[in-house]
Regions:
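Structural signature of tandem-repeat unit edges
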Residues: 1-2, 9-24, 34-47, 57-70, ...
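A short alpha-helix capping/helix-coil boundary motif
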Residues: 5-6, 53, 99, 124, ...
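Consensus positions within tandem repeat domains that build extended binding/scaffold surfaces
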Residues: 27-29, 49-52, 73-75, 95-98, ...
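Short acidic DE-rich linear segments
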Residues: 273-275
């Protein structure tokens, strides 16, 4: 393990250049270390500890070694100069809040075959200039507040493997288009709250739960299409300016009437097309 004590005791060399042979970068190793503007990780590095580089101000993207398995909680949080992150294919776990409040971060990329299956809680929370995210093909869960208040986030792929989108996961993001994956089961409370650029969203038939306020505050959302009956639909999932497209007599139809939402029936739409 390379620790803060190792760094203090080193003689010569650049701050942030970790000697070969170390597999673990210790918790808080470089916490708020103003001398570190670039980090060079050894090829043997497998784990980056909690808060290891929190508060450092890297001017270059970190070159992660292939073989890195885990980046722990808040490892790179509050780095206000970092612009791009590219993760290695070997990465299996990315800790909560790992890049929280990296407010100049613009691009995040995972290799398609990355082993990372969970996008952890608040991992990119308040990365206010993040515009583009490429998630790995194995992603299954996007946890609570993963992209909370990423207000410039316009482009993100949601792989077909995603089955759960957590509470406030995309709160106040800027996507204009949203293609929900066909195996999605859960849309959490306020998952897309205040995504003000969305205009139309189709809910796949795999979805069993839509949490309250899921699409509330999406002021430009004109249509939300739900052609099946989810097991659970929370209150006020949309604004009253939005139209619910559903099947006549369905649970969704009754839900729309209960909340006074405008409703359009898919059967009538088809009849008009045929006519």
């Amino acid at each position: 393990t390379y620790t803060a004590q190792n760094e203090r005791n080193r003689r010569g060399g650049e701050a942030g250049r970790i000697p070969a042979g170390y597999r673990y970068i210790g918790d808080k190793c470089f916490l708020n270390n103003g001398k570190v503007h670039e980090v060079v990780l050894p090829q043997e590095c497998r784990i980056i500890g909690k808060q290891a580089f929190e508060g450092c101000q890297f001017q270059k993207a970190v070159d992660f070694p292939e073989g890195l398995l885990e980046i722990k909680k808040r490892a790179f949080a509050e780095n206000h100069r970092l612009r791009k992150v590219v993760f290695p294919e070997s990465l299996e776990r990315l800790g909560a809040q790992a890049y929280q409040e990296c407010n100049t971060l613009r691009i995040v990329k995972f290799p398609n075959n990355s082993r990372c299956m969970v996008i952890s809680e608040a991992v990119f929370d308040s990365c206010v200039n993040l515009t583009t995210v490429r998630l790995p093909f194995r992603t299954q869960v996007i946890e609570r507040r993963a992209f909370y208040r990423c207000k410039e986030l316009r482009e993100i792929n949601l792989p077909v493997t995603v089955r759960e989108i957590g509470e406030e996961a995309f709160y106040f993001c800027a996507m204009e288009k949203l293609e929900l994956p066909p195996n999605l089961k859960v849309i959490g409370e306020s998952a897309f709250f205040r995504c003000k650029h969305l205009r139309e969203v189709y809910i796949p038939e795999s979805v069993k739960k839509i949490g309250r306020w899921a699409f509330h505050g999406c002021s430009r959302l004109e249509r939300l299409e739900i052609l099946h009956d989810p097991d659970e639909i929370g209150p006020w999932i949309i604004n009253k300016s939005c139209t619910l497209v559903c099947r006549k007599g369905s649970k969704v139809d009754h839900y729309a009437k209960e909340y006074g939402f405008k409703c359009e029936y898919v059967e009538e739409m088809m009849e008009r097309k045929e006519g």
